[in-house]
């Protein structure tokens, strides 16, 4: 399994809008991605939020994660960085 560790910045005062977008668009889209295993979105802190999305292969992780530097049109979220890691263990 491979994980995508994603760091995003949320525009100040737009946390509720970002959460609504996450629930309505991002979560359903990620669930349908090829090789999807699990994903976790962590609550924002100081305008930054992290997510971890786990896929069955590195290829699917790279295909299912957003590119760094992306801001969807009209979105209050900017994708700062995306890292890919092999999952060593889970519980």
Regions found by a protein language model. Name each.
Residues 1-50, 56-68, 76-91:
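Short S/T/G/P-rich N-terminal loop/turn motif that feeds into the first structured element of a domain
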